[in-house]
Each structure stands twice: as C-alpha cells, then as structure tokens.
C-alpha cells in the first residue's frame, strides 16, 4: 500500500456559535453577507491552529487570500437566543492545466450552518489560493507548500477553480452601469492588506438592488439567496472603481456583476465578479 500523502490532511470542525442579532433580517433569517462570519472558526482558525498561521507582518511571506466563494442561505427564521451549529472541513488541493502541470495550490473548505433544531440555515464552499505579494505574476505563484507546514510539498487532490467568465458574459453590454466613480476606504480592508472579500458582496448587493428597483422589481418580496464570487486581483484603500451588472437568468432571477478598477485601461478584465441569485419570500 502506498504511503499516505501528508498534504492530504483534512481538518474538521464542529462547534456552536452565538448569533449576532444585527446579522438577522426582519424575518429573523440570516442575511447572505453575514454567513462567512460564522464559518471563520471552521475555515481559518481550525486550520491555522493545526498547520500554522501566516505572518501578516512579513511582506515577503506566503499568504492564502480567498480566491472564490460560493454561498447559499435559507430564508428560515431562527431563535436568536440559541446558538448556530457549525460543521465544516478544510483541505489542500491543486489545480492543473490541460497538460496536467500544476497551476495553483489551494485550500478549500465546505461548511454548513444549522439552527438549534438542526435546520439548515446556510452552506458555503471557500477556496484560498497560495500566493506571494509581488508585482511579477510569475513570482506570485506558489507551487510548493511552505516547508514550515511540515506536511510535504504538494497535495494529491485535484480541483477546478471557478473563473470570472462563469459569472459574467463577455459578449454583450451590461444591463446596469454606473457613471460615477466610487472609492474603497480603510474600513473595508482586512489583515491581508486589501479590501475584504465580503465588501464586494455587500457593495454588489446594494448596486443590484438599486438596479432591480429601477427596473420595476418588487424588493419587498425578493431576497439574496445565493452568491458566487471570484477575486481576480485585489483592490486597495483609496482605489476608485465602478460596478456593472448583467441579467443572467429569470427562474430563479440571477444577476452577475463586476468591479472595474478606475485606473485600468478600457477593456481590462474586472478585478472581481459577483453572481447573485435572488428568491422570493413565501
């Protein structure tokens, strides 16, 4: 029997998490943009406790920022006095090109949140990519696990990375646009030294809601039930940006949006994309 690859370790978590009342809607349902805060211990803390955490003070170090996020939430009322039950697992994987050569090392996680009765409230799939902060794309790529992990160099598991092209069309004009430039601010950043991943979701939710309202949709009945996010390159405090969005489906209603950096040349690819799925209240 071949020796087990130590890089194929799976870290599992199971815990209770107190509900933060502002994370609930008027129907006492968990809002989409708050889901990941309840999964942080499962996806980040458990892994860092077992393998080790990055040194955020070392600009030359290896980091694992989120590259893709897939979230779904159920519009079910919960008891805010009873903690959520969180279950999750996280593991290493690699993506390869058509020839089978390694492209990226990643860490993925699959997590669920249930209420005290065991009713599913939310689920998510997260993917972090190993990278270095360097202006040269070739120098940013990490093709071997850091030796300090002590678990080998490359995992066996192969995965596919969600791409921006899966969320937004490239062959037609946006259905929603904004002409005025907006700017990211310091309060939207995190310890990875760039804009926090959930800020893109919150910003796009507001942009899409405004656009749907102008188009005649009834926002008293619609809610954001799911999101897929792809982060192609980071945004930083003080940077300007614009948002655009396209209708992607009708049943259910799906809107895909993109963030365009103000200083990028015309026709440049978006910095990030967010696909939102909407559902109706009963």
Positions of PLM-derived features:
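HotDog/MaoC-like acyl-thioester-processing domains
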Residues: 75-164, 231, 235-237, 247-282
């Amino acid at each position: 029997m071949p020796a087990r690859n130590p890089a194929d370790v799976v870290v599992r978590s199971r815990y209770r998490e107190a509900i933060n009342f502002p994370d609930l809607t008027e129907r006492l349902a968990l809002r989409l943009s708050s889901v990941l805060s309840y999964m942080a211990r499962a996806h980040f803390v458990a892994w860092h406790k077992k393998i080790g955490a990055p040194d955020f003070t070392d600009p030359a170090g290896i980091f694992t920022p989120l590259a893709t996020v897939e979230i779904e939430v159920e519009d079910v009322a919960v008891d805010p006095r009873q903690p959520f039950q969180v279950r999750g697992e996280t593991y290493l994987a690699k993506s390869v090109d058509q020839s089978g050569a390694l492209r990226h090392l990643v860490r993925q996680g699959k997590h669920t949140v249930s209420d005290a009765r065991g009713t599913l409230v939310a689920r998510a799939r997260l993917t972090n990519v190993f990278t270095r902060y360097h202006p040269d794309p070739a120098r940013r790529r990490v093709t071997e696990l850091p030796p300090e992990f002590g678990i080998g160099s490359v995992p066996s598991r192969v995965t596919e990375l969600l791409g921006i092209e899966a969320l937004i069309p490239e062959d037609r004009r946006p259905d929603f646009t904004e002409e005025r430039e907006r700017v990211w601010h310091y309060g939207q950043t995190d310890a990875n030294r760039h804009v926090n991943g959930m800020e893109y979701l919150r910003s796009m939710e507001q942009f899409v809601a405004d656009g749907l309202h102008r188009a005649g949709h009834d926002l008293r009945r619609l809610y954001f039930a799911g999101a897929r996010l792809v982060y192609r390159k980071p945004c930083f405090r003080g940077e300007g940006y614009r948002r655009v969005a396209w209708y992607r489906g009708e049943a259910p209603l799906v809107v895909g949006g993109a963030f365009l950096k103000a200083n990028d040349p015309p026709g440049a690819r978006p910095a990030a994309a967010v696909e939102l799925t909407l559902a109706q209240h009963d």
